[in-house]
Amino acid sequence: MIEADRLIHAEPQGPEERDEQIDRAMRPKLLDEYTGQDDTRAQLKIFIKAAQNRGEALDHMLIYGPPGLGKTTLAMIVANEMGVNIKSTSGPVLEKAGDLAALLTNLEPGDVLFIDEIHRLSSVVEEILYPAMEDYQLDIMIGEGPAARSIKLDLPPFTLIGATTRAGALTSPLRARFGIPLRLEFYNTKDLSSIVSRSANVLELPIDDEGAIELAKRSRGTPRIANRLLRRVRDFAEVKHDGEINKAVADLALDMLDIDSEGFDYMDRKLLLAIIDKFMGGPVGLDNLAAAIGEERETIEDVLEPFLIQQGFIQRTPRGRIATDRAYRHFDIIQPEK
């Protein structure tokens, strides 16, 4: 199965999710509308208020964590709270130093520059970013060969917000230049059910509390997945029932979509069962595991594993991956004695 084809894949997916009007409506605009991530929200309120009181641009910010948790949304909220414009791009798009220079020179004082997948910046672009972040200056080379010379352009004070799913992949010099590091965690069921209810309200979709909770339980702690499942369950409710989503309707729809009580799909179960059946519960190395299930090691490491580890189904040890007691219980398999 291709990772991007999964219904519970946390990256943006499909033409429906590219519908900007719906996407904008479902996103919170201000911190008071933002659900979950309580510590992060509390910190941001203080940092934003302090910057506003001093009349300064907010310090540069690095937002990291698994995909689908709201890094882009949070960047937009920061710009809204500061009352400034936001310009968005991504690391792979900025191929040349001139690409970044064009963005920086068009910023107004206090503006936010948001770079998604910042860990994928090229080294050439990254070198340009250092003086821009530290001194609000841009070093430009004029001419070629022996006649080449460097000139400095002053930039207005701005806030760089970088987002990444792989904070460890950032170079140390770049990471050190972010004054505000923020890690986003998987959402609990209570917060996620509130997000589901809010999104259903935006879509004018009737849903009761138990239906929202059932959707939240199977959404892997990820708002993007919760909103995607909500749309699919809506289709089921409109065709098979009277359009209203309750626990029974959500159960039937999600079972039909092959998403179990823990939010696992075929790929998750394949990974866990490979460790249990093919490697006797582990430990198993990442390369062997990738070969056994026919996936790239990066897909396992960055996409499948984080939620399974966080929920206690897999342990990552120096010797390899191990299936936990909880994994055996999930499949009603008796764990062998070792």
From Swiss-Prot:
Residues 1-22 are annotated as: Disordered. One of its GO terms (cellular component) is cytoplasm. GO terms for biological process: DNA recombination; DNA repair. Mg(2+) binds at T72. It is found in: Cytoplasm. Transmembrane segments: none annotated. Residues 4-187 are annotated as: Large ATPase domain (RuvB-L). Keywords: ATP-binding, Cytoplasm, DNA damage, DNA recombination, DNA repair, DNA-binding, Hydrolase, Nucleotide-binding. Residues 188-258 are annotated as: Small ATPAse domain (RuvB-S). One of its GO terms (molecular function) is four-way junction helicase activity. It catalyses: ATP + H2O = ADP + phosphate + H(+). Residues 261-338 are annotated as: Head domain (RuvB-H). CDD domains: AAA. ATP binds at R27, G68, K71, T72, T73, E134, D135, Y136, R177, Y187, R224. Gene3D superfamilies: 1.10.8.60, P-loop containing nucleotide triphosphate hydrolases, Winged helix-like DNA-binding domain superfamily/Winged helix DNA-binding domain. DNA binds at R297, R316, R321. It comes from the Bacteria. Its EC number is 3.6.4.-. SMART domains: AAA. Homohexamer. Forms an RuvA(8)-RuvB(12)-Holliday junction (HJ) complex. HJ DNA is sandwiched between 2 RuvA tetramers; dsDNA enters through RuvA and exits via RuvB. An RuvB hexamer assembles on each DNA strand where it exits the tetramer. Each RuvB hexamer is contacted by two RuvA subunits (via domain III) on 2 adjacent RuvB subunits; this complex drives branch migration. In the full resolvosome a probable DNA-RuvA(4)-RuvB(12)-RuvC(2) complex forms which resolves the HJ. Has 3 domains, the large (RuvB-L) and small ATPase (RuvB-S) domains and the C-terminal head (RuvB-H) domain. The head domain binds DNA, while the ATPase domains jointly bind ATP, ADP or are empty depending on the state of the subunit in the translocation cycle. During a single DNA translocation step the structure of each domain remains the same, but their relative positions change. The RuvA-RuvB-RuvC complex processes Holliday junction (HJ) DNA during genetic recombination and DNA repair, while the RuvA-RuvB complex plays an important role in the rescue of blocked DNA replication forks via replication fork reversal (RFR). RuvA specifically binds to HJ cruciform DNA, conferring on it an open structure. The RuvB hexamer acts as an ATP-dependent pump, pulling dsDNA into and through the RuvAB complex. RuvB forms 2 homohexamers on either side of HJ DNA bound by 1 or 2 RuvA tetramers; 4 subunits per hexamer contact DNA at a time. Belongs to the RuvB family. This is Holliday junction branch migration complex subunit RuvB.
